[in-house]
Amino acid sequence: MNRVSFIKTPFNIGAKWRLEDVFLLIIMILLNYPVYYQQPFERQFYINDLTISHPYATTERVNNNMLFVYSFVVPSLTILIIGSILADRRHLIFILYTSLLGLSLAWFSTSFFTNFIKNWIGRLRPDFLDRCQPVEGLPLDTLFTAKDVCTTKNHERLLDGFRTTPSGHSSESFAGLGYLYFWLCGQLLTESPLMPLWRKMVAFLPLLGAALIALSRTQDYRHHFVDVILGSMLGYIMAHFFYRRIFPPIDDPLPFKPLMDDSDVTLEEAVTHQRIPDEELHPLSDEGM
């Protein structure tokens, strides 16, 4: 058995088209929903804890549907449009396929791990007491559990109050828009010293959008700042991991070309990242001095 492919033949078409990654993606998608709705760990709390005493916002600045559009649909459409414009026809289908595969893996894997972690941590949201509606007359500075003191009839909303760390909006926005940032850097050759600065600024826009989405969760009192920071870090790391699984580093001589791309596509004009030879930097030799 081959150590690389785990099959009897050393090479197969599935390696180039990353069929095993497609299978992993399907598993992540199927597991996401049940993982999120698992029973979270219910931590004890004080009814006079000011950090969980904020009002419950009935209207969110970025709800779940908007999050999916901003962090997954928009990056997907951007990749399809820009990729169709810039990519050479010899590898157009492959570059679009692998680019979208990497984005999907980054987004759904981040969502899976975020939901799994937040259910195990069970930290309370900033608006938890408004969700709980505790009975009146309870003593201060005393630990309580939700089942003992909460009077709300909305059990699903109450359980969601235990899912704050890390922030899913933050992790998923940085997973999708962070991946788009890396992808734009590679496709626009932003790390080449010959390219204008505006390319880097355009590539940076998705990160700005992700940051605004993440910060909106503190404005809605859905998350603490540490939840947003941890979620953003998780999403960014996952975006980088899955981007590098598909593409070379953004400072590679051919950063736009997928790693498994066997086409002969190269840059029309050579863009090198090599150091200038010392003799060009110091043309005067010892003999001429």
Swiss-Prot record:
Optimum pH is 6.0-8.5. Optimum pH for geranylgeranyl-P-P phosphatase reaction is 5.0-5.5. Residues 1-21, 87-92, 244-289 are vacuolar. Inhibited by sodium fluoride (NaF) and pyrophosphate. Strongly inhibited by manganese ion and, to a lower extent, by magnesium and calcium ions. Also inhibited by Cu(2+) ion. In an indirect manner, it is also inhibited by the zinc ion which is able to form a complex with DGPP and prevent the enzyme from removing the phosphate from the substrate. Not inhibited by N-ethylmaleimide. It is an enzyme of class 3 (hydrolase). Residues 216-227 are annotated as: Phosphatase sequence motif III. The modification Phosphoserine is found at residue 285. Signal peptide: none annotated. It is a multi-pass membrane protein. The chain crosses the membrane at residues 22-42, 66-86, 93-113, 173-193, 194-214, 223-243. Residues 43-65, 114-172, 215-222 are cytoplasmic. Residues 166-169 are annotated as: Phosphatase sequence motif II. The phosphatase sequence motif I (including Arg-125) and II (including His-169) are part of the cytoplasmic loop 2 and phosphatase sequence motif III (including His-223) is part of the cytoplasmic loop 3. This is Diacylglycerol pyrophosphate phosphatase 1.
